[in-house]
Structure formats: C-alpha cells, structure tokens
C-alpha cells in the first residue's frame, strides 16, 4: 500500500485546530512540528524552566498528515480549513511514502556516531567500530538525545578532554542521560543526572542500566545534596540564565561548570548571568552553537 504525507505550514494559532480537523476527517495520523527545528530560529516550548507551555504550537508550525492512497489531499485540506473557519485553505505539498519494513528502514538510517577521539554512540544493532572505543549503546527513539546535535557533541568532546578520575559529577537537564553515562565511562566518581521530565529520568535509568553504568537519575527535588567537582548543563540559553545561581551553588570552589545549548549570539548574555560567581568563556563552537566552561574561584 502507498501512503502520502500532506505537509502544511500554518500560523501558530491554527496548528492545533487544523491538525485535529485533519484527523477527524480521515487522516491516518497527524503531527505538529517546529518548521524551524534544528536551526538557530527553533523555539523551545515544553519541559524547560522559563518556557512554560502557555502556547501549544510554534510561530511557524508544520502540520504533517499521513493519508491513505484513497484520500484526496485537496478535498481534505479544504474541508479541514472550512471546519475551523479559515478564509482559505493553506498551501500544502504532498509526498509519497512507500510501505516499508519500517524497523529495517529505521535501522538503516542510524549508523554509529563518532564523537571526539574515541567516543562512539552505537545503536544496539551495530557493533562498536573500534575495540578501544568508549561506547554508548543508545537507540534513536528511546531517548531524549542521541549525540547527533552539535551541543551534545560539544559537551561530550569537552568531557573526553577534561574529565578527571573520581570527580563527583552532576548532569543537569540530563535528557537521555548520555552526558552522565559518558562521563562515568570516562572515569568520574559519583555521577548524578537530574531532569524535570519524569520520562527523561526513566529513559536515563534505562540507558544507564543498558550501558552497565552506575549513575543516579532523579527529579530535581530528589537529587543528592551538596556540591560537585563538575557540573554539566546542556539545556537552552533562557533556562540556563534563570538557573545561574542554582547551578553555580552546585559547583564546589575550584570545581568546573560546563554549559551548552547556547547559540553563538547568546554566549555573551549567558556568560554575564554567571559572571559574579563563575567566569565563563567559549571553549568551542560548532554550527552556530557554543560550549561555555569556567572554574569556580576557590
């Protein structure tokens, strides 16, 4: 059977209603995406301090509807637009999606990711490319971050070059747990991951067990107390600025702080939020993103 995807770019205020109308009118599935995802203009909406979900779509939203081969995209889009009171049907494109062995197709699209000198993120259906590699077994779709984003790569490269054996380490905003897991594999001591999303905490625990790593993951209120030799936070600039005093307080005197999720144009503002406690500088930049690091004065 041949399927088709109908792709529409719509205004934020219309995205949710239009997606519901498309589904009610016979679309097999409908999703709403940020049309600017993976660009410097992407918008954070959910699951971040300072970005409460007061709106349910992005400024430039992309609605993707999966249609069966018997559906008429023009009629469906027109009917959906009429159902929600739009004066005109939005422009759309249609692309064919052949029926496939989706498991095999997905696996073919995810190869091992090489990061730094010796770190590899390897899907479970692949073997490690190097016997001496630091290997993280992590499947796409089971996690909130698999090492492909520039900010994750920057943090992992920093860890590979700077981790000291036995350091007490905190990964704040741990997502999939990837940074905490690689830090532990590189030799840190007690290693803790914290996230405000319970699903991320569960994903991190699963990934740590799968990688045979002893690391603790929890919600912020359940996190261990005290300071850390190393604190890593790969989030986004606004929550990083809001959490500056809290994160600085978690770093022991003489300890180090590493931040990413920051665009190059945002680096100065983020560093300014931390300047009174920890002077930060750009360690490395990639694809418009930066990794900031600094040492807390003793």
From Swiss-Prot:
Binding, S-adenosyl-L-methionine: 152, 173, 195, 234
UniProt record, GO biological process = methylation
The alphabetized UniProt keywords are: Cytoplasm, Methyltransferase, S-adenosyl-L-methionine, Transferase
Name a GO CC annotation attached to this entry. cytosol
The record's annotation in CDD domains points to:
AdoMet_MTases
The protein's annotated catalytic reaction(s) are: L-lysyl-[protein] + 3 S-adenosyl-L-methionine = N(6),N(6),N(6)-trimethyl-L-lysyl-[protein] + 3 S-adenosyl-L-homocysteine + 3 H(+)
EC numbers listed for it are 2.1.1.-
Location(s) in or outside the cell: Cytoplasm
**What InterPro entries does its record include?**
Ribosomal_L11_MeTrfase_PrmA (IPR050078), Ribosomal_PrmA_MeTrfase (IPR004498), SAM-dependent_MTases_sf (IPR029063)
The protein's GO terms of the molecular function aspect are: protein-lysine N-methyltransferase activity
- Group of enzyme by EC: transferase
Chief subcellular location equals cytoplasm
Physiological role: Methylates ribosomal protein L11.
The UniProt similarity line reads:
Belongs to the methyltransferase superfamily. PrmA family.
Name-wise, this protein is Ribosomal protein L11 methyltransferase
From which source organism is this entry?
Ralstonia nicotianae (strain ATCC BAA-1114 / GMI1000) (Ralstonia solanacearum)
Q: Which gene encodes it?
A: prmA
